[in-house]
Amino acid sequence: MAIILPELPYAYDALEPQFDAETMSLHHDKHHATYVANTNAALEKHPEIGENLEELLADVTKIPEDIRQALINNGGGHLNHALFWELLSPEKQDVTPDVAQAIDDAFGSFDAFKEQFTAAATGRFGSGWAWLVVNKEGQLEITSTANQDTPISEGKKPILALDVWEHAYYLNYRNVRPNYIKAFFEIINWKKVSELYQAAK
């Protein structure tokens, strides 16, 4: 067995105008595919550890040292992107009632949540991700990680993710990351967020 690159659940151009087809094609077929290939190359060196990336990245000390950073970078990159694709929707969706209530409880209002999430995504220096997670106490929390690090390694369960690597937005938004973040909020798959939230609580 090997880690497989998942197909996008929609056409490359399905998220336009927010996310353009060329970016989606490059992002999925080149960047994500490279993470998958490099993950498999690392795992082949240690077949005894298996291929459950979520379990491995939940406690990176259990990953053999010679492939640990490769799996953090590439295994994390695969998991992060596989989740990211599912969190995007060609059809505009309203926030589901359960998630809306949880956001109100945690942040005071949806606008306050959006402001804090945007700040986390904008403030992540260099490459990384912004996240809405369910923490160990079962509470919603906004966080960000560098590079392809995953909140799973901190014992947190991601339910919303935004890739803020420049490869995710530079063709369309150039250096204006805030416009990309604003566009992201227009194409979130809130049904998937709800599904992840219910499973993580």
Curated annotation (Swiss-Prot):
The keyword Ligase does not apply. Its main location: secreted. It comes from the Bacteria. It is an enzyme of class 1 (oxidoreductase). The keyword Cell inner membrane does not apply. Binds 1 Mn(2+) ion per subunit. PROSITE patterns: SOD_MN (PS00088). InterPro entries: Mn/Fe_SOD (IPR001189), Mn/Fe_SOD_BS (IPR019833), Mn/Fe_SOD_C (IPR019832), Mn/Fe_SOD_N (IPR019831), Mn/Fe_SOD_N_sf (IPR036324), SOD_C_sf (IPR036314). Gene3D superfamilies: Fe,Mn superoxide dismutase (SOD) domain, Iron/manganese superoxide dismutase, C-terminal domain. GO terms for cellular component: cytoplasm; extracellular region. It is found in: Secreted. Mn(2+) binds at residues 27, 81, 163, 167. Its cofactor is Mn(2+). One of its GO terms (molecular function) is metal ion binding. It catalyses: 2 superoxide + 2 H(+) = H2O2 + O2. Keywords: Manganese, Metal-binding, Oxidoreductase, Secreted. Its EC number is 1.15.1.1. Homodimer. Destroys superoxide anion radicals which are normally produced within the cells and which are toxic to biological systems. Belongs to the iron/manganese superoxide dismutase family. This is Superoxide dismutase [Mn]. It comes from Streptococcus pyogenes serotype M18 (strain MGAS8232). The gene is sodA.
